[in-house]
Curated annotation (Swiss-Prot):
Organism: Arabidopsis thaliana
Disulfide bonds: none
Pathway in which this enzyme or protein is active: Protein modification; protein ubiquitination
Gene3D superfamilies, A to Z: Zinc/RING finger domain, C3HC4 (zinc finger) (3.30.40.10)
GO biological process: protein ubiquitination
Keywords, in A-Z order: Membrane, Metal-binding, Signal, Transferase, Transmembrane, Transmembrane helix, Ubl conjugation pathway, Zinc, Zinc-finger
Record-given protein name: RING-H2 finger protein ATL11
Gene this protein is translated from: ATL11
């Protein structure tokens, strides 16, 4: 606190005392005058009473003391309210030497709660809905989550690059002027110097290649080099197939659910999210934002689907299992330490076709894929989908192994 501000504070307190003394004096005179008028009226009403006896009988000192006490209480209440307000303003760090800043701590809080600058808001791309209507992925109608109105072909949309949510410019601009997050998913929209935004497209949900099976399995993978773990979560349409997963102690599978990039259920946000092919998305965003957009590699196949994404690791090897559309197992080991090699053990299918192979690095690794009791319970004994039993070990031992 500067000396000037302290001087003004002292002046206000001293001035308060002066005004209080004058107020007390005025109230005391008013009390005396009212008491004299009351005596005059009462003397006229008695008609013949003695003036001395009337004055002594009608003067009530208790009432006068009570009035003075009440006035003093009101004065001290006003004084302490002003004093407490001054102390609060001092805590807020205001400069009371400047009379224009007095009482502006609420305005300071409003400034701290401001949203994005207009220059940042203008960096979010805008376009007409008719230009992307035929290119968007998904058949559900697209709506603005602020006004809940469906977009028309001639309306202008504003895209939030971080979450791909779209709004009317009038709706979202009013929000962003007082907030710094997306109103739908609460994504932080404040740009950080040197930050590069990564726009992640979930494989299978965007950029589906021509000829791919729309009912095929879609998979998202997370690699953990520290724990040498790759855990995959299969988004299968056939929920009757049991899932198996093996991990090194991290329950990473629970981190990924059937949701989109915002962390909320996709069925609730599809009508507010504009999903475009990656190249079109980059064309919309890159002219206004000098940031990097990266897409995850597409893990799909028109002939084979991934039934499960469970993985195990043994002796610096990664194993993954996948099943083609006929339910035949394809198990591939890959070494993560040089030299990188894979080994295979050919096993002829009962039908005699040479195209079905079971690949593994050693007989021990096949034990990791042995059929669990849940597979026996749900799939039955005659179903060969996902079957890796000890019977295969005997047939595999009879076939020589080839090292690539």
């Amino acid at each position: 606190m500067n000396p000037k501000g302290r001087t003004n504070l002292n002046r206000s307190i001293i001035g308060g005392h002066d005004h209080g003394s004058i107020l007390q004096l005025l109230l005391f005179l008013l009390l005396l005058s009212s008491h004299g008028g009351f005596k005059f009226v009462a003397g006229q009403a008695t008609h013949g009473g003695s003036d001395v006896s009337g004055d002594s009988s009608r003067f009530d000192p208790t009432m006068a003391i009570l009035m003075i006490v009440l006035v003093s209480v009101f004065f001290f209440l006003g004084f302490f309210s002003v004093y407490i307000r001054r102390c609060l303003e001092r805590v807020m760090g205001m400069d009371y030497g400047n009379p224009n800043d007095a009482g502006n701590w609420l305005a300071t809080n409003r400034q701290q709660a401001r949203g994005l600058d207009a220059s940042i808001i203008e960096t979010f791309p805008t376009f007409q809905y008719s230009t992307v209507k035929t290119l968007r992925i998904g058949k559900e109608a697209l709506e603005c989550s602020v006004c809940l109105n469906e977009f028309e072909d001639d309306e202008t949309l504003r895209l939030i690059p971080k979450c791909c949510h779209v709004f009317h410019p009038g709706c979202i601009d009013a929000w962003l002027r007082s907030h710094t997050t997306c109103p739908l998913c609460r994504a932080d929209l404040i740009p950080v110097p040197g930050e590069s935004i990564v726009s992640i497209q979930i494989p299978g949900l965007v950029n589906d290649p021509p000829g791919s099976d729309p009912n095929g399995d879609r998979i998202r993978s997370l690699g953990s080099p520290d724990a040498r773990l790759i855990e995959s979560v299969a988004l299968t349409c056939n929920q009757s197939m049991p899932r198996r997963s093996m991990s090194t102690g991290w329950n990473l599978a629970g981190m990924f659910t059937n949701s989109d990039r915002t962390g909320q259920h996709s069925e609730n946000l599809d009508r507010f999210t504009l999903r475009l092919p990656q190249d079109i998305h980059n064309k919309l965003v890159n002219p206004n934002l000098s940031k990097v957009h990266v897409a995850l590699p597409q893990v799909m196949s028109s002939t084979r689907g991934y039934r499960t994404g469970s993985l195990g690791s043994e002796r610096n090897y990664f194993y993954y299992e996948r099943f083609d559309q006929d339910g035949r197992l394809d198990r591939r080991p890959f070494s993560i330490t040089p030299p990188y090699r894979t080994s295979s053990i050919n096993h002829m299918s009962p039908g005699g076709s040479g195209g079905d192979k079971v690949r593994a690095s050693s007989p021990k690794s096949l034990l990791l894929a042995m059929r669990s009791p849940f597979d026996r319970l749900f799939l039955g004994k005659n179903n060969n989908v996902g079957e890796n039993s000890s019977d295969h070990l005997r047939s595999c031992d009879a076939t020589p192994s080839n090292t690539v």
